[in-house]
Every structure is written in structure tokens, then in C-alpha cells.
């Protein structure tokens, strides 16, 4: 064939050129980064560049949407849906242990107005039933606990998938320490 393209060669070129925009779009998508302790995060909305950035010791107000990584992404808490327009943000001090450690790690470096999606592994996710945030609705709270702390599934080695959670965090306000 030396230097000429047959029908298959031309078809391959057409196929690749048609696919190029899809690859370019894929390359433009933000990639998750390791935020520490295995927490993966991606900024969906970067936040106001002139706004305060959250750091350890700051009090923050956040809106959350939490779902299980397993169980078809079952949503166990959604501040937007539950508030029906009257949203009450969660407030906690970063590093105080008031919320699961993965959520504290996930908010560090965010700026007010930003939205970040974080995938939180079991080691820094829910360890017991005293940790916040928990669903405001009793039935969702019970379902979360019976999924994450299910003794049969934990004995079967399913703990890593059951207690991995995904949160969308909207940083509403940073209250800088003293």
C-alpha cells in the first residue's frame, strides 16, 4: 500500500477527527485532587477570589448535600431540598472534631461562594453515631446508620464501600478566628 490510504484508513481519520472535540471537552473538565487523608475533591464553583479562604481554626457556615458512594448514590441529606428555600447552614469550627474529619479536610482552602465535591473514605468518614452532620429527618438518619454500621455487611468486608460518602459543600461564610 506504500503511502496511500485505503477505505479503512480514511474511515479511521474521520472517526478520530470526529472524536477530537469529545477528548478536548474531557481534558477541560476539572480533575479531583487529593486534599489529604485520602479525601478527593474537585471545585465545581471556585468561589469569590477576593473572599476569605477557610483554614484550620476558622468557623465556617456551609450548605451540604450528602450521599453514599455505594447504594446508587442515595442522598441522605440535602440542605436545599429539606429547607424548601429556608436554608439553615451548618456551622462548625474547622479542626474541632464537631463534624466528620473528611468534611473538615474538604472545606480547607475553599473560598466563600465556592462549591466543592468531596469523596470521603471510611477512615475519615462516620466512625460512630455521634458525628455530625446527620440527616435532619429521622428515617434518613436511621437508614444512614443501618447502612454504614451494618454488622453483617461489615463482617463481609463491605465497610470500605458502605462508609465512603460524597458531599457537595457550598461555603457560605468564613468567620475568621479572633
Q: Residues of each region from the PLM?
A:
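Cross-family detector of peptidyl-prolyl cis-trans isomerase
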Residues: 2-178
Amino acid at each position: 500500500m506504500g503511502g496511500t490510504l485505503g477505505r479503512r484508513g480514511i474511515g479511521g481519520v474521520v472517526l478520530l477527527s470526529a472524536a477530537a472535540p469529545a477528548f478536548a471537552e474531557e481534558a477541560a473538565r476539572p480533575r479531583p485532587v487529593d486534599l489529604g487523608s485520602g479525601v478527593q475533591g474537585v471545585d465545581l464553583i471556585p468561589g469569590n477570589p477576593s473572599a476569605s479562604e477557610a483554614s484550620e481554626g476558622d468557623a465556617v457556615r456551609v450548605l451540604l448535600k450528602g450521599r453514599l458512594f455505594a447504594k446508587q448514590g442515595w442522598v441522605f441529606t440535602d440542605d436545599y431540598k429539606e429547607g424548601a428555600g429556608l436554608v439553615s447552614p451548618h456551622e462548625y469550627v474547622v479542626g474541632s472534631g464537631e463534624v466528620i474529619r473528611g468534611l473538615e479536610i474538604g472545606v480547607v482552602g475553599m473560598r466563600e461562594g465556592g462549591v466543592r465535591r468531596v469523596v470521603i473514605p471510611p477512615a475519615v468518614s462516620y466512625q460512630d453515631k455521634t458525628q455530625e452532620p446527620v440527616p435532619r429527618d429521622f428515617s434518613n438518619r436511621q437508614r444512614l446508620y443501618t447502612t454504614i454500621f451494618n454488622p453483617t455487611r461489615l463482617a463481609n468486608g463491605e465497610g470500605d464501600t458502605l462508609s465512603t460518602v460524597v458531599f457537595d459543600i457550598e461555603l457560605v461564610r468564613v468567620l475568621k478566628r479572633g
